[in-house]
């Protein structure tokens, strides 16, 4: 959008990226990643010949949907009338056909706030994020919920057992050269995001 504001030739590209945002939001929210019981997004493992398996391990991956937030200011719509018209058509089409539409809030006609996460799910994700026995630590946000310290995640896939446990220091296994980065420590780059 920023480029399109300065060069109208990119208006079609901005529209395409907006449509892709909507389709990604639909995939995240409508295709088995959200768990209503745990109120969290999980990875979904698809194995040929089997039903998709939701990997109910609370990792920072389930929080990354919070990163995709954007505000579209009224002045952008004013400078890009075709973009505004296409977005309006796309929204009407999806709503008319009962298709997913991402969390969108408008403030007095001035700006549009877009988020991959619907408001009601956002509240639950923030509860996980800000809970000291889950993701929040003195040093930042953990990569794996501290919940898994006493409750390791176990899954059996094709007869092989796998376990993931909160392990924020030196790894207790030799996998990946003893690297435990996915098992609880704080990663500054992700905390910055």
Predicted features along the sequence, with ranges:
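Acidic, mature catalytic/reactive cores of soluble proteins
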Residues: 1-193
